[in-house]
Amino acid sequence: MVGYSSHAATFKVATLSPDGSFWMKTMREAGKEVEAATDNRVTFKWYPGGVMGDDKAVLRKMRVGQLQGAALPMGELLSFFPDSQAYGIPFLFNSYEEVDYVRSQLDDALIAGFAEGGMEVLGIAEGGFGYFLTAEPVRVPADLQQQRVWVPQNDVVSARLAQSIGVTPIPLTLPDVLPGLQTGLVNT
């Protein structure tokens, strides 16, 4: 006879990803698979769209046990494993095929590095390629230097890239980007 706990566990998981987004749909599908495989002894309560606060607030809530999980951008995870920024190096990849190949070689090492830093990783999701978007034409670096350029808060790689071409980056959390655009704090 194999014994197991009949107690149910509900994992509370937060993310900035909006409800209805590809990422939330994927997380919900994965959660349903776990729920089915455990006969609903393990369930999930999702907190999308930043309702639990920004990424720093979510990490604090995880530390005190209010949340059991989160989907976080790599920049927020630097304190657990500094090499986590490897995939964010600008212009490193030329195609999604190249990304897939490199990920097949490095994901396990990243997951192990996070575990050593105290963070259990259930998966790594791609965010796609990053682009500068602005209402003003940008033809040369001097044009970009005149813009108010947003970079994700704690994204060291993006901030250093901006600085390397003479741009003073404005780091903001994702929920602060739309208000920043509306008020003119950032425009790129």
Protein language model annotation of sequence segments:
Residues 32, 63, 68, 73-170:
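Contiguous mixed-secondary-structure segments that line small-molecule binding/active-site clefts
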Residues 47-60, 153-157, 169-183:
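Short helix-initiation/N-cap motifs at beta->coil->alpha
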Residues 9-11, 147:
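Nucleotide donor/acceptor-binding cores
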Residues 184-188:
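Short, intrinsically disordered, charge-balanced linker/junction segments flanking boundaries
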Residues 24-31, 56-59, 107, 159-162, ...:
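Extracytoplasmic/secreted envelope proteins and their assembly/folding machinery
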Residues 12-29, 49-54:
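Extracytoplasmic "Venus flytrap"
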Residues 29, 33-37, 43-68, 84, ...:
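Extracytoplasmic small-molecule ligand-binding "clamshell" domains
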